[in-house]
């Protein structure tokens, strides 16, 4: 069985760029997206749509 660190689709958390709150948990494919993932999502803390970036 493969280790979690070498998993092709690991779980990642997305944090708001503005307030740094970790609002979302998702999966990503490391082969297609080797860099940090950045998505525009709604931040309930800020109350607006903001860029959310993968945090470690």
From Swiss-Prot:
Protein's GO biological process: translation
Superkingdom of source: Bacteria
Residues in coiled coil: none
Recorded GO MF terms: structural constituent of ribosome
Keywords on record: Ribonucleoprotein, Ribosomal protein
GO cellular component, one term: cytoplasm
Protein family: Belongs to the bacterial ribosomal protein bL33 family.
Name of this chain's protein: Large ribosomal subunit protein bL33B
């Amino acid at each position: 069985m493969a280790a979690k660190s070498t998993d092709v689709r690991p779980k990642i958390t997305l944090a708001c760029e503005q307030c740094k709150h970790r609002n979302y948990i998702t999966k990503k494919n490391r082969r297609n997206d080797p860099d940090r993932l950045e998505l525009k999502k709604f931040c309930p803390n800020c109350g607006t749509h903001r860029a959310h970036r993968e945090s470690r």
